[in-house]
Curated annotation (Swiss-Prot):
It comes from Nocardia farcinica (strain IFM 10152). Substrate binds at S154, K258, T259, G260. The class A beta-lactamase family has a specific amino-acid numbering system, sometimes called Ambler or ABL numbering and often misspelt as Amber. A multiple sequence alignment was used to derive a consensus sequence and then the consensus was numbered taking into account insertions and deletions. This allows use of identical numbers, e.g. for active site residues, despite differences in protein length. UniProt always uses natural numbering of residues, hence there appear to be differences in numbering between this entry and some papers. NCBIfam families: bla_class_A. GO terms for biological process: beta-lactam antibiotic catabolic process; response to antibiotic. This is Beta-lactamase FAR-1. Residues 1-28 form the signal peptide. SUPFAM superfamilies: beta-lactamase/transpeptidase-like (SSF56601). The active site is at S94 (acyl-ester intermediate), E190 (proton acceptor). PROSITE patterns: BETA_LACTAMASE_A. It comes from the Bacteria. It is a lipid-anchor.
Length: 313
């Protein structure tokens, strides 16, 4: 069967080239480079020296920005962990979108032609912030194009179409359970899933849980190498995270990430960041405020990233 037509990825330019460079670098490390056994249990390890060094800085950031901040980061080479409120719940928001496409990649190899199928949807199904899908109602979009849109520009209608293919929020949650994540849950669709006031458990995750899920899909053996490489391509091509984790890592690092935003100033970013030598660090930053009208502040996540990098390196 024909492979997936991903010619539209060429529009990503520099990010797509960066993804190729990362994969080439990993490819020099072994036959199944970049893959590690999936360890997806959603819990932190014992506090490490790295966590101790960063805790005061995270608390100071919370005070300065008036936000609650959750952090989980792991240097997958050294095993060092930074954790802060890592098992507390935050709104998942659009961070689900990369995981949802990972779920499809697990069930449908690229060579199957599944991602070439055209999905059609009505004008009535188009929700707010859908910059790609709103222009394609007449033609529909392939599954691959929907994944590209929902990851790289966080198109909400594309996210809902991917959820439909998975059996809705319940099907997505079942996928997370299959990874060993007994914590995260998705209950609603875009855009209602972004309404997560303090104390709400619907549509939530924890920094430790979401980091474990992205680690399993991007670095683990949940996906075969072609599908893992495709997911990395989409994440590295993301255009919505330049002021978050990407702004806090050193020059020369390559970041593949998925952002999210919601009510109460909710602001998230989950990433795999490859150092200049190709060593992967998984970083999950989740945040929110008590004021339902609060605005997100990307500087909080950028500064938290700098603290993570300092503690781990």
């Amino acid at each position: 069967m024909p492979g997936v037509d991903i010619s539209f990825l060429k529009k990503s330019g520099r990010r797509t080239m960066a993804a190729a460079a990362v994969i080439a670098l990993l490819g020099g490390c072994g036959a199944d480079a970049g893959s590690e056994p999936a360890t997806t249990a959603a819990s932190t390890t014992a506090p490490s020296a790295a966590t101790d060094a960063a805790t005061a800085e995270f608390a100071a950031l919370e005070q300065r920005f008036g936000a609650r901040l959750g952090v989980y980061a792991v240097d997958t080479t050294s095993g060092a962990v930074v954790a802060y409120r890592a098992d507390e719940r935050f709104g998942m928001a659009s961070t689900f979108k990369g995981l949802a496409c990972g779920a499809l990649l697990r069930e449908h190899p690229l060579s199957s032609g599944y991602f070439d199928q055209v999905v059609r949807y009505s004008r009535e199904e188009v929700v707010s912030y859908s910059p790609v899908t709103e222009t394609r109602v007449d033609t529909g979009m392939t599954v691959a194009e929907l994944c590209h849109a929902t990851i790289t520009v966080s198109d909400n209608t594309a996210g809902n179409q991917i959820l439909k293919l998975l059996g809705g929020p319940a099907g997505f949650t079942a996928f997370l359970r299959s990874l060993g994540d007994e914590v995260s849950r998705l209950d609603r669709w875009e855009t209602e899933l972004n309404e997560v006031p303090p104390g709400e458990e619907r549509d939530t995750t924890t920094p430790a849980a979401v980091a474990a899920n992205y680690r399993a899909l991007v670095l683990g053996d949940v996906l075969a190498e072609p599908e893992r490489a495709q997911l990395r391509d989409w994440l590295v091509a993301n255009t919505t995270g330049d002021q978050r984790i990407r702004a806090g890592v050193p020059a020369g690092w390559t970041v593949g990430d998925k952002t999210g935003g919601g009510s109460h100033g909710g602001n998230n970013d989950v990433a795999v960041a490859w150092t200049e030598t190709g060593d992967p660090i998984v970083i999950a930053l989740l945040s929110h405020r008590t004021d339902p009208a609060a605005k997100a502040d990307n500087a909080l996540l950028a500064e938290a990233t700098r603290a993570v990098v300092t503690a781990l390196r």
